[in-house]
Amino acid sequence: MAKQVVIKIEEGSFELGFPVSLEFLQDGRIIARERKCPQLPPNPDFPRVYDQWRNIYTGLGNIYTESFPDFRVIETQEGQITHVSSLEDCQNATLTLESNVRNWFGQPIFGAITARIIGELKDGTPNESVRVIVDTSNDYLRKLSWDYWDLFEKPYFLPQAEFALLSQYDRPTKKLKQSIKILAIFGSDEGGLQLQQDRELIENLNKYGARITSIPARGNSLTPQELFDSLWLGNWDIIFYAGHSSGQTIHVDHALNLSIDLLREALRRNAPRVKLAIFNSCDGLGIAEYLADFNIPHLIVMREPVPDLVARRFLKYFLEEFTQGKPLHTSVREARKHIFMIHLPTLRVI
């Protein structure tokens, strides 16, 4: 039986705190609600500390070019001030951010919320998989490293728990049929992205019985018409995109950026059939927010830029777990664990 806990965070602020309520679901059906939860405590320093870390982290891209020849980065706007960061600066900023987040999660209110969640799930088996969904429209809360919370870190609480983000949830996930249909979309490889290796990872799934359509054909550039037609005509279980993105824009080729809103009608037609969308690109929260309106059950995005090698390794580890029949959120958790073993400043951005 699939269990979910939805932590609904209402409008608030880091200065005053955030109202919160809980919903418990089993097999897509709400079985309990908890509306009298303690309010999340204030954390007025978090936006500043996060922005400082993010500026240093993205500025580190020039250094990582030596080790990782391609970096899925957010494009700099004209007139924007940028700085080249050192690895030490990034490590220090990461420690400051981690300390801020751990101190926040260490406040008694989070212990009280944990107790209510554990109390509601006390009849579950110790190794039962539980999906904990954080439902918020606040950008900073979406980017916060929720896996620092004891609810996820302490194995004696929910050892098989995995957090997810979303702004809407209605449609329970249907089990994927044995022969799944995958649309693999490959955008711009500007900056030296090794999209050919992403393509090989996806197309290798045919050995598990998946039916894969890749666009564009090898050696060609993606066009908006090809993208629209493929989304419109297909009956896809999984949509996969690899390339660059920023906000709600994907980079079709070196000279063309395409607003995902131009694909609205094609998405409206086929999104009800889609079980999973994966965007192996930087700055994916804008795309995730847009696609949430189409009620796709599962979206995997990068919350911040990551080196291309790391994005590809995450994809590899995730697909290895997922194709063995493990639940999606369990596959994401295991892939994250693999990635955290790579000694980079911080990779809690997927």
Roles of regions detected by a PLM:
Residues 130-136, 216, 278-280:
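Extended hydrophobic secondary-structure segments that form protein cores and membrane-embedded regions
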Residues 162-165, 238-317:
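Catalytic cores of nucleophile-dependent amide-cleaving enzymes
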Residues 148, 153-173, 249, 256-272, ...:
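Caspase-like cysteine protease fold
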Residues 314-326:
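Active-site proximal helix-loop segment of RNase H-like, two-metal nucleases, encompassing DDE(D)
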Residues 137, 171-257, 290:
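A domain-level signal for caspase-like cysteine endopeptidase catalytic cores
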Residues 127-131, 177-179, 235-236, 272-274:
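A general structural motif
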Residues 1-146, 152-154:
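Non-catalytic, solvent-exposed interaction/assembly segments
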